From Swiss-Prot:
Keyword field: Coiled coil, Cytoplasm, GTPase activation, Vacuole
Name of the gene: mgp1
Positions with biased composition (Acidic residues): 730-741
Protein name: GTPase activating protein homolog 1
The keyword Cytoplasm is annotated on this UniProt entry: yes
Coiled coil regions in record: 184-276
Domain F-BAR: 90-344
Compositional bias annotation for Low complexity: 65-87, 403-449, 490-513, 757-836
Region listing for Disordered, in residue ranges: 65-91, 403-468, 490-518, 727-836
Species per Swiss-Prot/TrEMBL record: Dictyostelium discoideum (Social amoeba)
Signal peptide (residue range): none
């Protein structure tokens, strides 16, 4: 476009973004360069307005020269802002370099700092309150019990000081809460409201500036558009100007005139909008922004003053604490002298004085003087096996306590049994040579004078009738020599209930009658007592209650009741049945009830029964594993059973075997392992006689019990496999051994019949891939038979029948002597105990019988089937060939329960494991 042909009325927009804008120098753009310059101007204008809002107050005070403002004034203001007058105080309005956005961030951080201080005051007040209560509670329960005790008065002085200190800290806590926490909390709320209002005002001011700049932009765009339309109409008119005859020229002229008027109007509007924006920035915007900055500055000053005041007050409260405490301590200094140790000692001696007593000296008494305590049957018996053993199964008294004999200075004998007052028996006067009494009469007189005392199986010394000097271990704890001969004799004397045993019992009864006639009183013992009672007393009381049944218990009745209850309640399915303990009060209450009733019928809590079971074992006066073998057994835990067989009385062995076998089955059927069950039962089964070594030997004690359980577990597993898979080889002349080369028994009919006075041997046959029908019949005129049939589903028909006859384990008998089989007790008939000659030990076997009341009854029976008519037993089984352990073995092999009045069902399992506690 030629400049010469340009319309003088059209103005050109100057190519400067922030230069002055007026109507004299505005002209429409005639090319692309001018159009781009116009767009660049609008962009710079918007950016400038945005920077104005977030720039410093000095920049806002000197905005760009958008109209009417000269460049010189702008430069002067800029130079003045770069120089700060140090003589004047700085302010947010004039000297803030970060602007409005920095103030917003600072106010947010300031509120957070106030909240942190508020939280500190709250926690400190809470801690002071707790400390005050703890101090006051230290001596809150202390009361002066003796007004004459000066030391107690001194302690009360400490209580007074603590109360004073507690009051001081309580006051400090209240001051923090009342004078610091609550006022600061209200101030923070007010500051948050003020900050919110300031932020809203700043946001509104920013929006107003943005709207004003947006209006300038719109008016500029409208103005440029109309200018371009006018230029276009002018070009079209020039092109058509050569053709004067055409009517189009007139139309173009009218269009040009119209666009010219519109562009002039848009130009006026554009100038007016620029003036309004400049006035807003320099007037309203500047004033409102300055006011907002001043309020922010006042907000910060107020906040800092509040923080300073609270910190000063807190320090002042802290200074008051030691001063107040020092005053309290100074006021009580003189009261410390009230404590007079000499006066306290004199008052105590005066109130507890008693005359001086001199103890009588002890006098030695020879060991032979204890011979009157020995059973008369053991002195007069002609059998060497009977004279070398002491019958522990028939205790001579019901007390079951340790008997000590001391000779007083007057020559009388004092017998103390631990359960009653000492009994003093006058000693016989010296007899002259002319008045000598025959030895037999002397013996009778001595028996009449000496009361029948209980021979403690684990602590009192048994007497050697042959006069042999025994070792210290035997004399103190009353155990036999480990020699095989003596152990055989003791076992024979205990298990054979013959005429000699009756004589011993009669002798004990006669001695008791003589003692009653002599006027010497014995302590009255509750026959239902269970806890803290010797095993001998328990078994004697149980047998006396069942005296009319003609049977004697092998273990205490309460032990079988504990096991029955635990099995019936399925304790092996419970978690932590022996670990979870009821409250101590409940245990003590149930122990008192049991001592009165003697039965567990009303207890259904399996955890309570388990706790009572452990308490009963632990309360035994003498532990099951005696003190006599303690050191020996903890040094050799692998030989625990061997040491026990020759080291503790037979009744203790029976009970120990019974408990260990129960634990074996419990471990096998529960989730508990042998080590865990050993840790639980070790403290009640074995006790250290030395208090100092109890902790040092605890691991050794656990190892002993664990080895015993493992040995019983392995023995039981071996016995079960032998009973299931191996034939028992009889040594009877009438028996036939028909084994073929393959190890199977292929006889079509293999039967073995013995007489009434012989023990029948049970043949257990493996019927795998064999066509046979093996029947073993044991004839006994006094019992019926119980049949257990195991049928294997093979290609052939196999039938194994094992008929076992035992007078003790039969529920289908018609004899009156076996009424106890329906009573739920563990019994053994007289004359039917096995006397084993292997290693001097006895092998027992506990089976389970059921009654119509769903009781599971352990019955002590022979490990192998026996049949005896005259009290003597003959074993037809070679235990060496079977590899059976030579020890007393009690097991829970077969368990059955009767859910109705029908016959009991014996359960036998085909897996390799043994004895599964199950109910069918």
């Amino acid at each position: 476009m030629n400049v010469e042909n340009q319309d003088p009325n059209i103005m050109v927009i100057p190519n400067n973004n922030l230069g002055p804008i007026d109507g004299n120098n505005i002209s429409p753009a005639m090319n692309d360069e001018n159009s781009n310059n116009g767009s660049s101007f609008l962009k710079n204008l918007v950016n400038t307005g945005t920077n104005l809002l977030f720039s410093s107050s000095s920049s806002i005070a000197s905005p760009p020269n958008l109209g009417g403002l000269s460049n010189d004034s702008t430069n002067n203001n800029s130079n003045s802002n770069n120089t700060i007058d140090s003589s004047k105080p700085l302010s947010f309005e004039n000297d803030m370099s970060d602007g409005y956005e920095a103030l917003v961030r600072r106010s947010e951080i300031a509120i957070d700092q106030c909240k942190e201080l508020l939280d500190f005051f709250k926690k400190r007040a809470s801690e002071e309150e707790k400390y005050s209560k703890n101090i006051s509670n230290m001596f809150s329960k202390f009361k002066v019990k003796d007004d004459h005790d000066t030391f107690q008065k001194g302690v009360s002085l400490l209580n007074k000081i603590n109360d004073a200190e507690s009051t001081i800290h309580r006051s400090f806590s209240q001051n923090i809460t009342t004078n610091l926490y609550h006022p600061l909390n209200e101030a923070i709320k007010d500051m948050e409201k003020s900050r919110k209002r300031l932020l809203e005002d700043g946001k509104k001011l920013k929006n107003d500036l943005k709207d004003s700049i947006e209006n300038v932009k719109k008016s500029n765009q409208k103005y440029e558009k109309l200018c371009r339309e006018m230029e276009q109409a002018k070009l079209e008119l020039i092109e058509e100007g050569n053709d004067t005859k055409s009517g189009k020229v007139e139309t173009l002229e009218k269009k040009l005139e119209k666009t010219k008027l519109a562009s002039i109007k848009a130009e006026d509007e554009y100038k007016e909008q620029i003036n309004e924006t400049n006035e807003f920035i320099s007037g309203v915007y500047q004033n409102r922004l300055s006011e907002n900055l001043r309020e922010f500055q006042q907000f910060e000053l107020t906040r800092l003053e509040i923080m300073k005041s609270n910190i000063r007050n807190y320090i002042g409260f802290m200074k008051d604490i030691p001063q107040a405490l020092q005053c309290e301590i100074d006021s009580t200094k003189g009261f410390v002298d009230i404590i007079d140790p000499e006066v306290d000692l004199q008052n105590y001696i005066m109130n507890n004085s008693n005359p001086k007593k001199v103890l009588l000296p002890f006098i030695f008494e020879a060991y032979n003087d204890h011979k009157p305590f020995v059973d008369q049957h053991n002195q007069n018996s002609s059998s060497s096996s009977s004279t070398n053993a002491l019958n522990y199964a028939s205790p001579m008294s019901a007390s079951g306590s340790i008997t000590n004999t001391i000779t007083s200075q007057s020559g009388s004998t004092i017998i103390s049994n631990g359960a009653s007052q000492p009994i003093e028996i006058p000693s016989p006067q010296p007899i002259s040579e002319q008045q000598q009494i025959p030895p037999q009469q002397q013996q009778q007189q001595q028996q009449a004078q000496v009361p029948p005392t209980s021979i403690n199986q684990s602590s009192s010394p048994p007497v050697n009738p042959m006069g042999r000097q025994q070792s210290l271990k035997e004399n103190i704890f009353g155990f036999f020599n480990k020699a095989t001969t003596n152990l055989k004799s003791s076992t024979s004397s205990l298990l054979t209930k013959d005429g000699n045993s009756t004589t011993s019992s009669n002798t004990s009864t006669s001695n008791s009658n003589q003692l009653s006639k002599s006027g010497i009183g014995l302590p009255i013992i509750n026959t239902n007592s269970i806890f803290g009672v010797e095993l001998e007393v328990l078994i004697e009381n149980d047998n006396s209650k069942k005296k009319g049944n003609g049977v004697e218990l092998e273990v205490p009745l309460i032990l079988t009741q504990f096991v029955q209850a635990l099995l019936k309640l399925e304790s092996f399915k419970m978690d932590g049945v022996f670990v979870s303990l009821p409250s101590h009060f409940n245990i003590q209450q149930e122990k008192q009830k049991l001592d009165q009733t003697g039965t567990l019928e009303n207890i259904t809590d399996v955890y309570l029964i388990a706790s009572l079971f452990k308490n009963w074992i632990g309360d035994l006066p003498n532990p099951l594993i005696s003190y006599a073998i303690y050191q020996e057994i903890i040094e050799a835990p692998d030989n625990a059973w061997k040491i026990i067989e020759s080291g503790i009385p037979i009744l203790h062995r029976r009970v120990l075997h019974y408990i260990i076998d129960f634990l074996v089955d419990f471990v096998n059927c529960s989730k508990m392992d042998t080590h865990s069950i050993s840790l639980i039962f070790t403290p009640v089964l074995i006790r250290s006689p030395f208090n100092g070594d109890s902790l040092l030997n605890s691991k050794k004690e656990v190892a002993v019990i664990e080895n015993m359980i493992i040995d019983s577990l392995e023995t039981k597993r071996g016995n079960y496999i032998l009973k299931r898979n191996l034939p028992i080889i009889p040594d009877d002349e009438n028996s036939d051994d028909d084994d073929d080369d393959s190890g199977h028994i292929d006889d079509e009919n293999n039967s073995s019949t013995s007489g009434e006075n012989d023990i029948n041997t049970t043949n257990i046959n493996n019927n795998n891939n064999v066509n046979s029908n093996n029947d073993t019949n044991n004839n006994n005129n006094n019992s019926n038979t119980t049949t257990t049939n195991n049928n294997n589903n093979n290609d052939s028909n196999n039938s194994n029948s094992t008929n076992n006859n035992n007078n003790n384990n039969n529920n289908n008998t018609n004899n009156d002597d076996n009424e106890s089989n329906n009573s739920g007790y563990g019994v053994s008939s007289n004359g039917n105990n096995i006397n084993s000659s292997v290693g001097g030990s006895v092998t027992h076997h506990f089976l389970y019988q059921t009654t119509p009341t769903n009781n599971v009854t352990p019955v002590l029976s022979d490990f192998f089937d026996t049949n005896s008519s005259n009290g003597s037993s003959k074993a037809n089984t070679n235990t060496h060939n079977l590899g059976v352990r030579n020890s007393s073995n009690i097991s829970f092999d077969t368990i059955s329960t009767n859910q109705s009045d029908s016959e009991p069902v014996l359960v036998e399992y085909d897996n390799d494991d043994f004895d599964i506690l199950s109910y069918k």
